[in-house]
Amino acid sequence: TSPEMFERVEVLKGPSALLNGMPPKGSAGGAINLVTKRAGDKPLTRLTGSYQSDSQFGGHLDLGRRFGDKQQFGVRFNGVYRDGDTALKNQDKKVSQVALGLDWRGERARVSADLYRGTDMGHGLTRGLTLATGVAVPRPPRPDVSWNPPWAYYDGTDRGAMLRGELDVTDQLTAYVAAGTSKTELETLMGPGQLINQAGDF
C-alpha cells in the first residue's frame, strides 16, 4: 500500500504482545502503528506532482473537509497514481491508490472509518541475488541493470476497511473498540537469482 494515506508512522519500542497480540513470526518486542489521515478543522486541497528517473511521473490529490453545524463530520480523500520506467534498464512500475477516511466527533465520543484500495504492478524487478557454495564475493554489478528479465513481473492489489469508536468514560479514562479487515491478491512470475561462478553467470 502506498504511504500517502497515512498521517504518520509510529514506532513503538519494547514488548507489546499484551497490547497488540503476538506477530505471526512470534516476536514479542515493539510494534509499528500506521495512523491514517483525518480531515482537519481547515479545508484542505493539495495536488502534488512527482518525477523519478528514468521517466516515472505521478500525482497525488489530498482533499479534506468538515461538515455540520459543529464541524462534527469529516471526510479525507487521498488519490495516488504513478507510472513509468524506473532508473534500472528494462524495469517499469505502476502504483495507484484511493483511500477515504470518514469521522464523526461528538462531545465525549468519536467514530472513524477507513476504506482503501491500492494496486502495485511492475516488470523486470530485482528480488536479490545470492552466492552459490564456493563462489567468492565478486565486485558489485552496475547499479542501473536489473538481474531479472523484462518479462518477470508482479501484480498486487490491496483492499481494506477499518472501523474505530472511542468513548471518554471520564476525563482520565477512554474506552475504545476497533475492527478491520484486509485482503491482498498477488500474481507474480519472478524469483531471487543465484550467482554460480566468478564470470557472473546466474
Residue map of PLM features:
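A beta-strand signature from Gram-negative outer-membrane beta-barrel systems
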Residues: 3-48, 71, 88
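Short loop/turn segments at secondary-structure transitions that flank enzyme active sites
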Residues: 38-40, 119, 183
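Flexible, surface-exposed loop regions and adjacent strand-edge segments
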Residues: 26, 92-98, 128-138, 191-201
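Outer membrane beta-barrel
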Residues: 1-8, 107-113
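Transmembrane beta-barrel wall of Gram-negative outer-membrane proteins
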Residues: 44, 51-129, 138-142, 149-180
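Short intrinsically disordered, low-complexity coil segments enriched in acidic
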Residues: 1-4, 17, 32, 152-153, ...
